[in-house]
């Protein structure tokens, strides 16, 4: 049995459905979703991510607007630019590519995006909806992608033990809320956790998002583990590897996502899905 999860194939299924849905919008309303991507500076890694987002958006019929601003921009000026996008009725969704330069107040910027156009799901209001169990607003895309993969291979999560290694607002915290809603018993671990392997090795599901190359080795898992590696670490020659020692772990677990080709494509698919949701909400479809 092939236990390596093909995130690209799963993402392509979502993209195919979105493409059909958007074609229907165009026939019915003569309009289509539009995603604004705000980039500050010219970080090479950010440029690669944005290129992939635009490519996939165009593939399904979502228009895009790239707003590329100087690294030297002030927080207030960036907020003003975001407000312009908030008021633009042609824009369905807005994302701000992270990380931002250290001179910019990231919390203020993420809070400036209109919650109803918050395709990334980072606005405090949307975060509050998620953690309050209110079925409203937008959920961070990587967390949605992780949950979709997990449910594909473990449809019934009732009573499952899930360990999330990493406590970020992008992955760890939102995914913990989603897994709790699925009736998992959830443990969040982080850099200060003692005896990490003794915790992860007992879990049914282990999600790793710490940004530390090949950190988790075979002894961190058991033969029934479903391992979701969210790590994206660039090493020499621009090669990308995950947080899990994939080559030595893959034969020791039930299922595992590779890096690249695992959660990355799913993140983009759910970003576009969120954008379509914002578009539908705006025109009350």
UniProtKB/Swiss-Prot annotation:
Ribonucleoprotein in keyword set: no
GO terms under biological process: L-histidine biosynthetic process; methionine biosynthetic process; purine nucleotide biosynthetic process; tetrahydrofolate interconversion
GO molecular function (one): methenyltetrahydrofolate cyclohydrolase activity
Residues at which NADP(+) binds: 166-168, 191, 232
InterPro entries given in the database record: Aminoacid_DH-like_N_sf (IPR046346), NAD(P)-bd_dom_sf (IPR036291), THF_DH/CycHdrlase (IPR000672), THF_DH/CycHdrlase_cat_dom (IPR020630), THF_DH/CycHdrlase_CS (IPR020867), THF_DH/CycHdrlase_NAD-bd_dom (IPR020631)
One protein family per Pfam: THF_DHG_CYH
Catalytic activity: (6R)-5,10-methylene-5,6,7,8-tetrahydrofolate + NADP(+) = (6R)-5,10-methenyltetrahydrofolate + NADPH; (6R)-5,10-methenyltetrahydrofolate + H2O = (6R)-10-formyltetrahydrofolate + H(+)
NADP is among the record's keywords: yes
PROSITE patterns: THF_DHG_CYH_1, THF_DHG_CYH_2
Family: Belongs to the tetrahydrofolate dehydrogenase/cyclohydrolase family.
NCBIfam families tied to this protein: PRK14171.1
Protein name: Bifunctional protein FolD
Organism: Rickettsia typhi (strain ATCC VR-144 / Wilmington)
Phylogenetic classification of the source organism: Bacteria, Pseudomonadati, Pseudomonadota, Alphaproteobacteria, Rickettsiales
Name of encoding gene: folD
